[in-house]
Amino acid sequence: MARDKDLSPYLDFDRETWRHLRMSMPQVLTEQEVVELRGIGENIDLDEVAEVYLPLSRLIHLQVHARQELTQATETFLGEKAPHIPFVIGVAGSVAVGKSTTARLLQVLLQRWDEHPRVDLVTTDGFLHPTEILKKRGILDRKGFPESYDQRALLRFVTDVKAGKAHVKAPVYSHTLYDRVENECVTVSRPDILIVEGLNVLQTGPTLSVSDLFDFSVYVDAALEDIERWYIDRFLKLRQLAFRAPNAHFSHYADMGDRAATDEARRIWQTINLPNLVEHILPTRVRASLVLCKGADHKVARVRMRKI
């Protein structure tokens, strides 16, 4: 049974309790599909999907269904058909914590429900200001911090999708080039569900924020020392992968030795990613509808679900 800590806004579930909330949902992914969805350095498997993500997809499905019933009630009241309003989900968390994998898994799992097969995923990386602008403003070393994003464009994008516009475009970002891809975009066309994944998607501001438009949100959490270790491990693996790609922005790291690469990864973590996490990302955790708490093995050990 979930632990209800008196004044806490969350219900706490250990993994054993949470997995039973899957009920009779069948496993809809194959091992190969999970491998293809897995991020660098992660060891997610079919058990993790069955015990963590299937219950989560069931919860979201029920909330989408409730929203659809509310829309039908509005239609009955007005005596006319209401415009289609996508259900919007935010997925937040630190660099290297596994939020991108969580978002991809949710997209695939939610697509398997007959009631909402059209599920789009957009990352906020595409809304980073172009590198040229960041250089002019002197904030290239603060890439990923709130001020490095075109917040207005991101808000306008989600607002347009939520308003039911037929075709809404979002810019595309290349981690290999470390910049937006010129003249390239993704188009979102009235999906049933839109997933928005990014570092700071749960942030608030003095006026309307993207997080105000979310119907549900997930924060992927872990101990700081674990995330640092995962970040360094991922950096070392990228030397043999993305850093060696043609035109790779970080190609100068490709031939670094293990010691030098580890030191550089730790420097980047401690001077950029850790401050961003502590100052801007972690404080938004309290706004999440649900928190996935990972253990040192990169697997979800506990789930916290907001009561209200």
Curated annotation (Swiss-Prot):
Lineage per the UniProt record: Bacteria, Bacillati, Actinomycetota, Actinomycetes, Mycobacteriales
Keywords: ATP-binding, Coenzyme A biosynthesis, Cytoplasm, Kinase, Nucleotide-binding, Transferase
Matching PANTHER family: URIDINE KINASE
Protein name listed in UniProt: Pantothenate kinase
Location, primary (coarse class): cytoplasm
Gene label: coaA
Compartment(s) of residence: Cytoplasm
Signal peptide: none
Any one of the GO BP annotations: coenzyme A biosynthetic process
A Pfam match: PRK
Binding site for ATP: 93-100
Pathway listed: Cofactor biosynthesis; coenzyme A biosynthesis; CoA from (R)-pantothenate: step 1/5
Enzyme Commission number(s) of this protein: 2.7.1.33
A Gene Ontology term for the protein's cellular component: cytoplasm
Catalytic reaction list: (R)-pantothenate + ATP = (R)-4'-phosphopantothenate + ADP + H(+)
Family statement drawn from the similarity comment of this UniProt entry: Belongs to the prokaryotic pantothenate kinase family.
